[in-house]
Amino acid sequence: MAAGYDLAGRVCRELHRAGLSAYVERPGASKQPGVWVEVNGQGEHAGGLYVRWSAPELAEAGMRAVTERQDPAAPEWKRYAEVVLLIQTALIGILRLAGFSVVRAEEVDDVAEGDVYVHADAIGREDS
């Protein structure tokens, strides 16, 4: 796990260099807006990272609109979903430029939609 946290620190540094707020997610730590970097400690991709964008205000507005109006196509929800995809694309580009091996997290974990996955052997490996 120590190697995973080292990798998470390097990812956060690169995101900070690009002007983004980024934090390593740790148990019990409060969630902040920006990019969360979570170390994956299980399964065949153990040691890799999930990189997740957090915009609580935007997410809450989208979820509230869907819940209150019972409308999964609510404009507020669509806006949130589109922002998540735009940020995902930007994060992939930023991290690949820095030399990390990254993919859309859905390619590794089908329930991680909108996240980015950084492979454990991220530095020095060609991207797929």
What is the meaning of each model-derived region?
Residues T89-S128:
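Acidic, proline/glycine-rich low-complexity IDRs
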Residues M63-V66, Y117:
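Surface-exposed beta-strand edges and their flanking turn/coil or helix-capping segments
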Residues M1, K78-E82, D109:
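A short, exposed loop/beta-hairpin motif centered on an aromatic-Gly-Thr core
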Residues T67, D71-G99:
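Short, hydrophobic/π-rich interface segment
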